[in-house]
């Protein structure tokens, strides 16, 4: 047994065992490597009760070896931790230097040309730089350039529909509805009822409907959508604490989404939009976030999911299932046996663009490359996530797979490993387009 010098050790004359007491911070001393404070006393035999014989030389040597082993392990742990820290620091510093250099290239060489004439931009250079991650200082501008503005959204247009949104917000937060919203966390039926009402109102606004109560329908739609937005905001990047009530971007998120549902009543609010708008707000000003959100949702590969187009969505889901079958046959076979298909995971990943499923820093890099590489990158990412967790998924039941998909945000995901997986997946846009045509 390891004993201590008289400054840290003590004996209990009433204790008949032959072990010395350890200091209260013994574990801390070992785990922090401060084992030099553990002093093996040559005269440790004196610490024994007088009624017991002194330690033998063999015991003394045994305890000496134990002490030296603790020292050796602690030293080895400290050295390993120091090397790991040094390695991580070097990687971090290299990334910082790389981003500084990249920012200069983006600001001086790429963005000016892109803004002047997009056809003359160096696409190869843009893609190479994007794989390293976009510098935060220019990310918002690059996203806007990639998304474009085919809808010709202006600040004036945003302010017009923001005015409509304020009316809907005021009606939504009136005492009767406010009471219902505040109880939504206690009653899951609130969420269901609101979404059912939303679908009903959308139906009443369809081109086939000849109701003369159009204005009332619009106000009801805006109010219902606003209620849904206020609910879902509470679960949007909750760990950041900036979008929830009282957070610095809470009102901005309401403004962007409120203006959007008034601008596009044919689409309204769809679950997942809070994450999209929040991601844009993290990287650009409010008006630009509205412009980007509007044009992003309007793009060919996203619009069917937000319009809940039952003729368009199945094509994308079938294309994803075919991709899994072609590139990861064993997983596809298992999924088919237990009844899992792309509809169980892809819709949520597309409507949130992975920002709900993946850590924020990883999702941000995914966004960079989706906007640069195009929609095909969505399916490369989706397949890479399935491959990343293939050891779990390939032996899971239906319920276990669904649980894994739902709890992805709680899973630890290595950014480097995930992107290595993505890079290993080769998908041809033209072949994928043919799958969509089937």
UniProtKB/Swiss-Prot annotation:
- This protein's source sits in the domain of life called Eukaryota
SUPFAM superfamilies noted in UniProt = Ypt/Rab-GAP domain of gyp1p (SSF47923)
GO-annotated biological processes:
contractile vacuole organization; hypotonic response; pore formation during contractile vacuole discharge; regulation of endocytosis by exocyst localization
Subcellular location, record wording = Contractile vacuole membrane; Cytoplasm
* Entry GO CC: contractile vacuolar membrane; contractile vacuole
Alphabetically sorted, this entry's keywords are: Coiled coil, Cytoplasm, GTPase activation, Membrane, Vacuole
The residues forming a coiled coil are 54-104
| Coarse class of the protein's main subcellular location | membrane
Q: Which GO terms describe its molecular function?
A: GTPase activator activity; small GTPase binding
Q: Which residues form the Rab-GAP TBC domain?
A: 133-374
Q: What does this protein do?
A: May act as a GTPase-activating protein for Rab family protein(s). Required for osmotic regulation by the contractile vacuole in hypo-osmotic environments. Essential for periodic fusion of the contractile vacuole with the plasma membrane and consequent expulsion of water from the cell body.
Task: Report what the protein is called.
Answer: Drainin
Tell me which species this is from. Answer: Dictyostelium discoideum
